[in-house]
Amino acid sequence: MTPFRRSLLVVATVLMAVASVHAAEFRFDSGTITLPDGFSVEVAAGPPLVERPVTIDFDERGRLYVTESSGTNIPVAEQVKNPTHRVFRLVDSDGDGTFDRRTVYAEGLMMPEGSLWYRGSLYVTAPPEIWKFTDADDDGVAESREVWFDAKTLTGCANDLHGPYLGRDGRIYWCKGAFAEQTYDLPGRPGWTTRASHIFRARDDSSDIEPVLTGGMDNPVDVVFTPEGERIMSCTFLVHPGGGERDGLIHAIYGGVYGKDHGVLD
């Protein structure tokens, strides 16, 4: 099953397969969550283990990899000179459903915008790069750190990259936001440049990069896959704002062009 990345305020534990229409409220310091009757929410990790979690993913042994913001809000042009964001590996040592041990798996990252555990490595998107971290001796600290993909752009809002996501076809997918110009070496088309938004995919060795979708939307944010392998993408500014419309979901058919008219599509 492809893991979904989500903010780690809480992790929901499903207690019943079928829920009734009744609702239950669970109150936490961060707010109140309302769920259908028969579902429960428990805090799986909180301070001091994690303070500002951004994304999570599990490995095959149930250990949790949490990307965390350092809390800085200085401009990205300054952040990139001394990146301060981190990745933690959390372990539930006694099996009670609450994580109780932490190691700093990786540090010195730009703002994390996605994470994916795949075949023994953790892929983390931190514009302008997607990193591949590997902990060969399993001590909870990644000793191997390599740039899996380098977009070579970093805009003020850092929408240059989102992802990565594992497709049903075994490829690794990621999103490019508009409107920075990036250059890709595509099979048979080296030096291909684009300012448009895209979904891209590649093999896990980063070879055979190809665009899956092209668009005039501002910021493709997330991609999920149906059991049949169909791609569903969420994005901001799918259409020009007006009449209560702006963001949207797209059934991302291979080779499709979507979103509002924009000069980046010319």
Give the residues covered by each predicted segment.
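Beta-propeller blade termini and top-face loops
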Residues: 24-266
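Bacterial N-terminal signal peptides
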Residues: 7-19
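N-terminal secretory signal peptides that target proteins for export/translocation
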Residues: 1-4
